[in-house]
């Protein structure tokens, strides 16, 4: 399990100072999702927390933020793993589940690893 918490304004200030930082941290899809919301920084902060929580849960030491992609669709967000994150999850034989939340001031996420027993993902 991994957890992360972030003050939203901290990320918003960092992105304002370094506009290209968003490209290093988030995929095109993640940035587009956030841009379509009233306060993009709130949604990017939750995704940043999810990436950190997944890295902690997997025990990653060297990884890229883009190795963990938060996918929003119907229902709860899911993660799509790439690079080192995907390799580590495969080596452990686990799937990753995330839960994201935010208030007006803070964002947080929890990542939980679970084993696949029959090749199918565990029920949600």
Describe each model-derived feature in a short phrase.
Residues 1-124:
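Core catalytic alpha/beta fold that binds nucleotide/phospho-ligands
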């Amino acid at each position: 399990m991994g957890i992360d918490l972030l003050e939203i304004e901290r990320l918003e200030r960092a992105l304002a100072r370094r506009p290209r930082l968003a490209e290093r941290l988030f995929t095109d899809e993640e940035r587009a999702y956030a841009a379509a919301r009233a306060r993009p920084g709130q949604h990017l902060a939750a995704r940043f927390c999810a990436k950190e929580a997944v890295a902690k849960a997997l025990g990653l030491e060297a990884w890229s933020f883009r190795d963990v992609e938060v996918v929003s669709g119907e229902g709860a967000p899911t993660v799509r793993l790439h690079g080192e994150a995907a390799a580590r999850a495969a080596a452990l034989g686990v799937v990753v589940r995330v839960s994201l939340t935010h208030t007006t001031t803070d964002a947080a996420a929890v990542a939980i690893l679970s084993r696949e027993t029959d090749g199918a993902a565990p029920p949600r």
